[in-house]
Amino acid sequence: MSQALTLARPYARAAFAIACEKGKCMQWSQALTFSAQVANNPIAATLLSHPQLDHEQAAALLSPEGADPAYVRFLEVIAEAHRLDVLLQVAGLYEKLRAEAEHVIKAKITSAIELAPNELNNIVTALKKRFDCEIEVTTGVDHSLIGGAVIDTGNVVIDGSIKSKLTRLQASLTH
């Protein structure tokens, strides 16, 4: 996995630089997501690995309809280097670069029960204040947390769950 990320990083940076230069960051984001999904489809992966398929045909297969010609050329370069297997990682890294550039943090909030809209708004407001940027939130429910919530922003995890508090209490009592 880490090798795939290492291989994908320069492609993601190049894609982001080209897309931003052309003012098409969102279009490339959508195109990369599409291409990564196609490349990870088992049937498409078999077709893409066929020895008679050249890099231009592979790029055409992976490109969404109406894709930017520079994007198609980008896919041709990846296909020519035999790196189509890292497209999923390229797409993920591209999204991180785009979020950083747009000053957006993606936060996953997992709670023991479904959060009420006002509770979610309070959490988002606190996160905006703490990180001084916009927050894109996804929510989830994990009943094993007993109560409270866990907020994961990728770089920072804030664990305010009852489960973790009980675990810490148990650890302090046994030591």
From Swiss-Prot:
Cellular compartments per GO CC: plasma membrane; proton-transporting ATP synthase complex
GO molecular-function terms, A-Z: proton-transporting ATP synthase activity, rotational mechanism
Domain of life of the native organism: Bacteria
Keyword list, A-Z: ATP synthesis, Cell inner membrane, Cell membrane, CF(1), Hydrogen ion transport, Ion transport, Membrane, Transport
Subcellular location: Cell inner membrane
Pfam families xref list: OSCP
Broad class of where this protein is predominantly found: membrane
SUPFAM superfamilies tied to this protein: N-terminal domain of the delta subunit of the F1F0-ATP synthase (SSF47928)
Subunit organization: F-type ATPases have 2 components, F(1) - the catalytic core - and F(0) - the membrane proton channel. F(1) has five subunits: alpha(3), beta(3), gamma(1), delta(1), epsilon(1). F(0) has three main subunits: a(1), b(2) and c(10-14). The alpha and beta chains form an alternating ring which encloses part of the gamma chain. F(1) is attached to F(0) by a central stalk formed by the gamma and epsilon chains, while a peripheral stalk is formed by the delta and b chains.
Family: Belongs to the ATPase delta chain family.
HAMAP family: ATP_synth_delta_bact (MF_01416)
Protein name in UniProt: ATP synthase subunit delta
Organism: Xylella fastidiosa (strain M12)
